[in-house]
C-alpha cells in the first residue's frame, strides 16, 4: 500500500488519477485547502500523529508527498502531541527555507519506518524527457543555455533560491525567487516585449536547487508556463533530465508544434 499525502495544485490530482487508472493500491490523505467531501482522510499538516496513524493502519511502507502545503499555522488548535515534540526543529527549518522543512517531514516518516519516494517511481511518464522538437536550436541559444546553467548552479549552491532564470542574448533578464516561475515570467513581460519586439529570442531555464530533495520537491512545468513563454516570444525552455515533471504534456506538445519553439533536456 502506498500513501499519498496530497497538498494543493494539479499534480496530486494527476497522481491519484493515474494510480486509479493503473489500479495501484493507495490511500490519499488530503492536506489541501480545498476539501473534498468524497475523500475519507482530511487533515491539517499539524495533525501529524493522525496522519501517521492512518498510514500505519493502511500498512503503508512508502509515501508520496505531492502538491503545495501551506506553512503551519502556529495558532491552529489542531496541533497534536507529536508535532509539539518537533516544534523547535520546525521553527529552525522554517528559518532556513522550505527545503529544510520537507527534510524534517521525511525524517519524521523515516522514524515511523515509512520511506518517502518520488511519484515518478510509479509514474515515470511524468518526466519531461522525451520531447521531439521541430525548431532548431541556434548557437546563441546554446550560449544562453550555458550561461543560465552556470548562473543557477553557482547561485543555488549558497542560497535556497534560483530555480529558474530567463536569459536573452547573453543578458540575464530575471532570476526566480519566492514568487515562482509563472510570476517571474509575468514580471519580466514588459522588458521581454521590448527585447523581442522585432524578433524571437531568449530562453527560460529551470534547474533543481542543490539542496532540493527530488523525491518530494520535483520542479514542475505545464501548459500555462509553455504558453506564457511562447507569448513572450522566447525561443524555448531548458530542463534537466529526470528532474522535472511535465504536466499537460499532450496539450503542451501540440502547442509547441504549432509555434516556433523548443523544449531542450540537458544533463
Regions found by a protein language model. Name each.
Residues 4-6, 27-30, 63-66, 116-121, ...:
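General beta-strand structural signal in soluble alpha/beta enzymes
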Residues 14-18, 64, 228, 251-252:
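A short acidic, amphipathic alpha-helical/loop segment
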Residues 51-122:
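N-terminal glycine-rich phosphate/adenylate-binding segment common to multiple enzyme folds
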Residues 31-36, 43-53, 60, 78-86, ...:
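Feature captures the catalytic cores and cofactor-binding loops of soluble hydro-lyases/lyases
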Residues 1, 22-25, 37, 59-61, ...:
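Short coil/turn connectors at secondary-structure junctions
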Residues 11-12, 95-99, 105, 112-230:
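Conserved mixed alpha/beta catalytic, RNA-binding, or beta-rich assembly cores of soluble enzyme
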Residues 13-15, 74-76, 249:
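Short glycine-/acidic-enriched loop or helix-start segments at secondary-structure transitions
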Residues 1-31:
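N-terminal basic/disordered segments at the start of proteins
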Amino acid at each position: 500500500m502506498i500513501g499519498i499525502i496530497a497538498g494543493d495544485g494539479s499534480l496530486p490530482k494527476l497522481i491519484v488519477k493515474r494510480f486509479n487508472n493503473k489500479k495501484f493500491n493507495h490511500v490519499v490523505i488530503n492536506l489541501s485547502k480545498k476539501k473534498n467531501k468524497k475523500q475519507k482522510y482530511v487533515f491539517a499538516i499539524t495533525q501529524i500523529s493522525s496522519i501517521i496513524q492512518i498510514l500505519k493502519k493502511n500498512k503503508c511502507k512508502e509515501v508520496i508527498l505531492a502538491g503545495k502545503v501551506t506553512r503551519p499555522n502556529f495558532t491552529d488548535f489542531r496541533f497534536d502531541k507529536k508535532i509539539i515534540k518537533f516544534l523547535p526543529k520546525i521553527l529552525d527549518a522554517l528559518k532556513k527555507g522550505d527545503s529544510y522543512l520537507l527534510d524534517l517531514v521525511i525524517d519524521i516518516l523515516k522514524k515511523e519506518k515509512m520511506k518517502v519516494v518520488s511519484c515518478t517511481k510509479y509514474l515515470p511518464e511524468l518526466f519531461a524527457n522525451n520531447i521531439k522538437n521541430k525548431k532548431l536550436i541556434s548557437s546563441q541559444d546554446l550560449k544562453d543555455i550555458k550561461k543560465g546553467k552556470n548562473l543557477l548552479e553557482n547561485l543555488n549552491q549558497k542560497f535556497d533560491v534560483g530555480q529558474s532564470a530567463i536569459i536573452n542574448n547573453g543578458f540575464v533578464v530575471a532570476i526566480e525567487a519566492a514568487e515562482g516561475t509563472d510570476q517571474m515570467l509575468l514580471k519580466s513581460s514588459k522588458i521581454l516585449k521590448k527585447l523581442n519586439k522585432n524578433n524571437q529570442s531568449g530562453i527560460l531555464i529551470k534547474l533543481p536547487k542543490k539542496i532540493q530533495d527530488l523525491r518530494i520537491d520535483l520542479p514542475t512545468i505545464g501548459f500555462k508556463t509553455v504558453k506564457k513563454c511562447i507569448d513572450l516570444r522566447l525561443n524555448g525552455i531548458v530542463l534537466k533530465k529526470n528532474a522535472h515533471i511535465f504536466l499537460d504534456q499532450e496539450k503542451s506538445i501540440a502547442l509547441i508544434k504549432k509555434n516556433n519553439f523548443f523544449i531542450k533536456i540537458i544533463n
